[in-house]
Amino acid sequence: MVVGVAGYYGFRNAGDEAILEAIARELQARGHEVVALSGDPKRTREDHGLRAYHRLNPLALLRADLWLLGGGGLLQDATSALSLTYYLSVLRLARLFRKRVVVFNQSLGPLSPWGERRVRKALQGVPVILRDQDSLEYARRLGIPAALGADPALLLPPPPVPREADLVIPRAGVQEEALTTLYVAANHLVHEGKQVLVLLLQPGYDDEVAEVFRLHRIERTSDPRRLLYLAAQAGYVISMRL
């Protein structure tokens, strides 16, 4: 079977790329061919070895027998109502093309009242698997049948490596107060003789953090394999959602 995966792929976000890597590995291990919708199909082909099509090409939905929407946090309109419109349109169009669709290990929300109505309508008759208990309870309140799964990135095997750094700080959307606290904590650990690695996970979006931590060791990566390698080396990890 050809299985398509639609999500926030091709934008060099390490968390989303880890999700795609994990989903593709599991499906391929079961004998399925995997294709992906991507904001940068060339990069997705190079990074993951998958057939990839531009996410704005509706005819790409004809290239798979089944489409998985996810994982990640796609079903929300707190950051953008346009983003929610896009993902719900992918679901509707795939069904119009008579393709099977599954909402796969997503989180759900936050949603505006208008967004709740749109999601409830779009998911009628669609199998829904959610990655956390809060999302599952939210779905039940909305009257959306759903099952509990987990974040696909947890399926990626950690590499066997010796530990080197004592702290890894992935960052996404850090507020000023939290950033100051992290900086103080990092300096304290350095004074204790620890090695500190500041890991920036979406190149181009972390300039503020790079400036604050400019005296520390910094690495920028959107490669999930590199992220796993560095995290496996760490004695401690301080992290936020990606």
PLM regions: where:
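Active-site anion-handling motifs in enzyme catalytic cores
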Residues: 1-242
